Amino acid sequence: MITLSINDKRVETKAAEDTPLLWILRDHLNMTGTKFGCGMALCGACTVHVAGEPVRSCTTPISAVAGKKITTIEAIGATRVGKAVQDAWVVENVPQCGYCQSGQVMAAAALLRENKKPTDAQIDEAMNGNLCRCATYPRIRAAIKRAARTLAS
């Protein structure tokens, strides 16, 4: 039995310890906000926070995150930074197809938690591993800047 802390809730699972966190979230807990994209930690659609850091859940075994605080897209809006990012995403009309957006939001929230006023280069570096098939990168950057301004006020 492995115990996980997901969105401030204790979850126990009998899944194999090498089961990727993504499948516990989606298949066992029906938390479908975190997406499966590539399965190789290359696209960022599966990004969640583990102990405050962005992690690719598609390749992260549950044994590696047992006892650590896991935050998903379903709960990021409860934080000041996460709410600012989500609100900016709406104002800037970031999503097109929307598939990558949960991972994008999670990466942006992690960036703004650490860097309150990122430059374009810092935004690009932080968001580098999050792919968007629809190429909404200019709107993603604009939303991150808007969220940073909101957090500064």
Which residues does each predicted region cover?
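Signature of N-terminal electron-transfer/Fe-S-associated modules in redox systems
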Residues: M1-S153
